Amino acid sequence: MVIGAQWGDEGKGKIVDYLAAKADVVVRSQGGNNAGHTVVTGGKAYPLRLMPSGIMYPDTVCIVGTGVVIDLKSLLEEMNTLKAQGVDPSNLQISTRAHVVFPYHIRLDEAEEARKGNRKIGTTKNGIGPCYADKINRIGIRICDLMDKDVFAEKLKYNVEVKNMLLERLYGVEGFDYEQMLKDYLGYAEQLRPYVCDTNHTVHKYIEEGKNVLFEGAQASMLDLDNGTYPYVTSSHPVAGGACVGAAIGPHLMQNIFGVVKAYSTRVGEGPFPTELNNEIGNTIREIAHEYGTVTGRPRRVGWLDARAVRYAAGLSSFDYLAITRLDVLDGMDEIKICVGYEKDGQPVEEYPADLKYLEQLTPVYRTFKGWKQNISGIRKYEELPENARAYVEAISELTGVPIGIVSVGPSREQTIVVKEVF
């Protein structure tokens, strides 16, 4: 399993793509098209949003699981783009139980974010939150509903009526035409019908057959709905437990859980970010690493690595190994810092606080490391990394209490140093 250990954009797609070479099945378990990830292979970048990263491998079954919320139009566009790039998506399976994102979800998302003004969350405005809200309210529409025209028509009619009332009366924006939406989505349903199946059944079948199954998380631990920096979080549970629920498997089947950690920290949108660098160092890292959102294009906030936050994330998902990414971005720096904990009024704070006002009053405690002046992007063996780079990586392991499994030194599949083989 691959889980983001920070605030997202850690490079999960690259790690999943690498591990998928030896996987028979890759399962996406939560989130929606708000989760952008990029796979680089053969010098070509493939930005993905709903597709599991294993789609690059023609013999790997790729499953969009029960916990995912699916924008059908976005998924079809992504499939067509991949086809145009020579990638065959015929190995895709879509869960009958997954919920569908509709245009009214997107418009509600946009309208509510605008209404919040200065209190905005920083949502991607892809309708993810409103779709999950319908799921919780038990009025959501699932993929299996779309496969039955009469069932779908009845459920859609109810939802369009309710959502139009909200949009027009509360937000003062235009609603939607039910007949047109029905026609559009029945068309999408027919295009996707060949890929739809009971993935709860197929996942267990593959496991029972002894297949190598890789579970791919979206977003990241610090954006978890319950345990992240609420309300500046996502609408699902991007932790190991959430993956179990979203993929419909029990926790004892999860082995080799990788926490993906960028060698520095980034965050998109609003919310607390204790180690943020609003200075030349932060700007330099952003430009070297091109830290702009895959989905939104927004510049990411940049900071030093927060080992306290990663240790908290490790506790949420019981990481077996860390996958350190973008270590090469730090090439040439004189000094590099890691946040090892927090203080308030000179006293150490042991927990990661829920109270965001309190969190913002904390002072990060840093440990400073010597940088390295060598270009490490061509290194393939851990022992060949510069001494200072190894010292930095090993400090991350020590401070988080999790051993190193993978070190990534570049965006491509080949730029990967494997410390621990899992397949």
Predicted feature residues:
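Non-transmembrane, aqueous-exposed alpha-helical and coiled segments at domain scale
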Residues: 1-423
